[in-house]
Amino acid sequence: MNEKIAILSTYSFVNIEEPANLIPKLLLIAKRKYVRGTILLSKEGFNGSFSGSYENVNLVLEELIKLTVPKDVNVKINYSDLHPFQKLKVRLKKEIVAMNVDDLNVDLFKGEYIESKDWDSFITKQDVIVIDTRNDYEVEIGTFKSAINPYTKTFKQFPAWVHQNEKLLKGKKIAMFCTGGIRCEKSTSLLKSIGYDDVYHLKGGILQYLEDTQNKNNLWQGECFVFDDRRAVEDDLSPSERHTRLPST
């Protein structure tokens, strides 16, 4: 029986003084271990999603942690019959998730995590506004019941949406979510930096929530878009048959 392919997604907001210096070291170990996918590096941290054997993706993760020394790191592993990535890329970026907001220190300044087990009860409270921080094409195929869709084409448009909807957000508890946690974590940092106090986000994102809860209360509706060859996953995290042929993004 063939071994399942492990798909490891990870990120951490951590100060990296010279991120370019890490690229050759990460490329070397990932190539040696036949790992495919993408790792983004910047001065604000790292963001990666890569696939291979369980042992080998964890060896790449260990090297990434050794080189960056984060205070905490978010890690999620799923499995697939096939590699969801065709190539290996390690890239230097200005931001590990592009928002185009200067001087945002997510490592020090962010909202509170809500664990998967507490998410359903939290987002159904009367004084909580739930915001999907993903792009409109992602929201279109699945989202949480009653979540607000900002209808953004890219994450860079999210700050403008926040400023345009001050009346909607003011005085509310704001709960945000995204695929794996990184965009909603950065979104909480944005809101905290401009004066919002009660800001929360789903720890580990939609994928962790679906694994932990199996969507037992049916608050998640539809499928979850993912940025690899699977295109989308069902609420049991199996690849979507309906969206397998969607064009790559």
UniProtKB/Swiss-Prot annotation:
Family: Belongs to the TrhO family.
Active site location: 178
Residue span(s) of domain Rhodanese: 124-218
Protein name: tRNA uridine(34) hydroxylase
Lineage of source species: Bacteria, Pseudomonadati, Pseudomonadota, Alphaproteobacteria, Rickettsiales
NCBIfam families: PRK01415.1
SMART domains: RHOD (SM00450)
Keyword annotations of the record: Oxidoreductase, tRNA processing
Gene Ontology annotations of biological process type: tRNA modification
A single GO molecular function term of this UniProt record: oxidoreductase activity, acting on paired donors, with incorporation or reduction of molecular oxygen
Catalytically driven reaction(s): uridine(34) in tRNA + AH2 + O2 = 5-hydroxyuridine(34) in tRNA + A + H2O
Function: Catalyzes oxygen-dependent 5-hydroxyuridine (ho5U) modification at position 34 in tRNAs.
Organism: Rickettsia canadensis (strain McKiel)
InterPro entries per UniProt: Rhodanese-like_dom, Rhodanese-like_dom_sf, TrhO, TRHO_N
E.C. no: 1.14.-.-
